[in-house]
Amino acid sequence: MPGVARPPLPLLSLPLLLLLLLLPRAGRPLDLADYTYDLGEEDAPELLNYKDPCKAAAFLGDIALDEEDLRAFQVQQAAVLRQQTARRPSIKAAGNSSALGGQGTSGQPQRESRGRWRGRPRSRRAATSRPERVWPDGVIPFVIGGNFTGSQRAVFRQAMRHWEKHTCVTFLERTDEDSYIVFTYRPCGCCSYVGRRGGGPQAISIGKNCDKFGIVVHELGHVIGFWHEHTRPDRDRHVSIVRENIQPGQEYNFLKMEVQEVESLGETYDFDSIMHYARNTFSRGIFLDTIVPKYEVNGVKPSIGQRTRLSKGDIAQARKLYKCPACGETLQDSTGNFSSPEYPNGYSAHMHCVWRISVTPGEKIILNFTSMDLYRSRLCWYDYVEVRDGFWRKAPLRGRFCGGKLPEPIVSTDSRLWVEFRSSSNWVGKGFFAVYEAICGGDVKKDNGHIQSPNYPDDYRPSKVCIWRIQVSEGFHVGLTFQSFEIERHDSCAYDYLEVRDGHSESSNLIGRYCGYEKPDDIKSTSSRLWLKFVSDGSINKAGFAVNFFKEVDECSRPNRGGCEQRCLNTLGSYKCSCDPGYELAPDKRRCEAACGGFLTKLNGSITSPGWPKEYPPNKNCIWQLVAPTQYRISLQFDFFETEGNDVCKYDFVEVRSGLTADSKLHGKFCGSEKPEVITSQYNNMRVEFKSDNTVSKKGFKAHFFSDKDECSKDNGGCQQDCVNTFGSYECQCRSGFVLHDNKHDCKEAGCEHKVTSTSGTITSPNWPDKYPSKKECTWAISSTPGHRVKLTFVEMDIESQPECAYDHLEVFDGRDAKAPVLGRFCGSKKPEPVLATGNRMFLRFYSDNSVQRKGFQASHSTECGGQVRADVKTKDLYSHAQFGDNNYPGGVDCEWVIVAEEGYGVELVFQTFEVEEETDCGYDYIELFDGYDSTAPRLGRYCGSGPPEEVYSAGDSVLVKFHSDDTISKKGFHLRYTSTKFQDTLHSRK
């Protein structure tokens, strides 16, 4: 599991340092190679320079160590190190590649280390002797890189708010601070430096599969100043290290710190710490323990390695490390209250309390004191409550209060308030009581900032109306970029929405009304003002939105045109260089060089990636524009294809469009090693774009193109209904309910019985989209994968209307034929709600009489997992997903099946195939079995990994099968068979 160690800022033990000092890189001076330059957003021209943990001098699990500490220790401990070497001759030199060596590249969250130590030892200091590693005033500025999705950004913010909620640490969007953290996606997976490094930005790498809440909380623990709990000097009294089960080369991750090197701040060993390794971290096998607790707590062996939330020990140590006041807290709810200690019974002397009120950016805080009874003094010198307009003690003072007079309500200018209470005497008065409330919207007069929906990154609240009026400096425009967007979807955004207008009022020109899950494009006002309105109704709530605003500058109007050699294009918040035809940007993104790609008018030919057949170079962007004569179509066939693979083709890819511009109809975006199918243009032109990033290079692609006359483009090829162009010819086709005439051009009515076995598709009335014929009866028998219910969703409906649908109608049955129960009879023009079968079969029957004809209907059929199924003596099948065997299971799935046998019988489950993402505690993807109808029944087991579990027998007449998958790695899934059985006394399960 990605690790965080809780002893704040301890350093390395001598056995560990021996390994470090023997590395061949020990003498390398720190240079610019230790820094990574990241564009953030794809076209950003300014480079972001940060301290890269993936290029650290050495690693301890997921902890990055820099050379400053290693050099210092090398000087101070040389003599002691020689003595330690003599006592422990069995330790191998780090230069031996079979034990220790160069940098690995694992990005898996359960594998925190790249598996190697590099560099020199860390200086030997206690936590309290390194105050520069503690963030001043507990304020940690941050930047989130541009390569993360909206959901990932939300996870990062939730993790930061989790630390803020329980400690006095504050995470703040960076403005002009020199030292700050940068969330990046780096090849080393999950890793971070411990504490503040100073002197500039430092990265926290959230690589592949690291974007889980608990893992991010853990990595932030390193940033705050914690090491792994199991490295404490007293750990041998609490846990045993099972060294024979540790992966070869990973033993150093279990070395123990010396007493002089660790400051545990007086806290006891914490099995529950989020900074503790799990039982099988770096294990040779998933069921082999590497760390085992030595004793029981409350009668059971404690579990270790949780990645769910901060433990009480984590919170206590963080509060001690950052010297949090003994009373007070961080308040994050939209409404709340707080009071002086022991209110209303009087407070004690020498009290110091701090309350940090933090609501969503874009909201303001109204603070009301409802009771005030403090010792009164001149200038409130002795006892007072102080309110500051911001996140810390140096924020602008809004008032210092004492005595008995109630202050006027205070409204913050931003989303944070700092409230501090101090007492110097024992006062018999009540103290004070205050309430606060978050209000959204208002006037925002500044040149840059952030606005988020109420309660972001959690779901926004119902029945909210928020209006923001943004104003930047005169002479500038307002730029708006969306970081995250998820608002209840509706075709016309009638329920929940964000509305943007180009001005300062509701009567200004409408730029757009937005909802759904796609981030809107960047927005630029025509003046220095912009108007935003967010509305939510009383029902469905989503994660909402996060948007940045800023004053927009035209960098291309400067004398040097942004340093561009040929062309400068102003973009929102930035600019980019471009080149004249025949040229392309060089790797520095400013100069131009001879381009790949080109404008091709030949009827046939070939194109290849740059450098073919060798690996293509980094940072290339090639565009081919293919043009054929009118009435021709262009086909593209790939002979070889190999690019850097990614689920969303984000890095290297080939993009094919019908048309010549970047917004033409997209045929596909391709990457990886699978050759795309033949692609045929919609018109007489095609655009092929190849793009590579600055990292992994592959062999690329080779493709040939050819042009063919489209006979269908003129008079529909003489076809009565549909004409389909083929290479060198064409063919006529008929719509649903018709067959092709012997003349191969006309269509005649035919039988209208259909058997549908695909997991998804479209069903239409005969002759759609034209009017259906009279006196027609059509049926569709839909069957899907066992365990998956058929769902029918209507796209369009226009059938002759009648109150009882007695004339023309569509009837839907819950089963294999018209004898099954009726799910609905439909007619008219109102689109019905989706129809869901109880099983994997659905039967449709369409009927038209001899009078009125309409357009008909169009519907899509799909599947939904789960439901109740019946077990009997005949063996039946159940599959994890409808496309089992063809595709891996999808992400973000939660399915529940209840398998019920007749009374007096049990249920037997036998897995035929089982392949689910593997994780120590089966916390990501898993199947879970319960001996009953719901999850309150006894659990039979939770399973993940590969290889089918043993047979499972229920003790009662039902079994609940739950299947969960997250949104990252997917596998083949499972296939199980179930039957009813009399043998209920045997239960096989494996947890």
From Swiss-Prot:
Which CDD domains does UniProt cross-reference here?
Answer: CUB, EGF_CA, ZnMc_BMP1_TLD
> Where is the secretion signal located?
1-25
Question: In a knockout, what does one observe?
Answer: Deletion mice are perinatally lethal, with the most obvious gross abnormality being failure of ventral body wall closure, and persistent herniation of the gut. This phenotype likely reflects the defective and weakened nature of extracellular matrix (ECM) in these embryos. Double knockout mice (BMP1 and TLL1) display progressive defects in teeth and bone development.
Residues carrying sugar: 96, 147, 337, 368, 604
User: Where would you say this protein principally sits, based on its record?
Assistant: Golgi
Q: Identify the domain of life.
A: Eukaryota
Query: Which residue spans adopt a coiled-coil conformation according to this UniProt entry?
Result: none
Please write the reaction equations for the catalytic activity of this protein: Cleavage of the C-terminal propeptide at Ala-|-Asp in type I and II procollagens and at Arg-|-Asp in type III
Query: Residues in domain EGF-like?
Result: 552-593, 708-748
Compartments in which it is found? Golgi apparatus, trans-Golgi network; Secreted, Extracellular space, Extracellular matrix; Secreted
Report residues binding Zn(2+).
218, 222, 228
Statement: the UniProt record of this protein carries the keyword Hydrolase: yes
Tell me the ranges covered by the Peptidase M12A domain, including all copies: 126-325
Which residues lie within the region annotated Disordered?
Answer: 86-131
Q: Name one GO cellular component term.
A: Golgi apparatus
Q: Which InterPro entries does the entry link to?
A: BMP_1/tolloid-like (IPR015446), CUB_dom (IPR000859), EGF-like_Ca-bd_dom (IPR001881), EGF-like_dom (IPR000742), EGF-type_Asp/Asn_hydroxyl_site (IPR000152), EGF_Ca-bd_CS (IPR018097), MetalloPept_cat_dom_sf (IPR024079), NOTCH1_EGF-like (IPR049883)
- Physiological role: Metalloprotease that plays key roles in regulating the formation of the extracellular matrix (ECM) via processing of various precursor proteins into mature functional enzymes or structural proteins. Thereby participates in several developmental and physiological processes such as cartilage and bone formation, muscle growth and homeostasis, wound healing and tissue repair.
How does this protein assemble?
A: Interacts with POSTN, the interaction promotes deposition on the extracellular matrix.
Q: This chain belongs to which protein, by name?
A: Bone morphogenetic protein 1
What species is given as this protein's source? Mus musculus
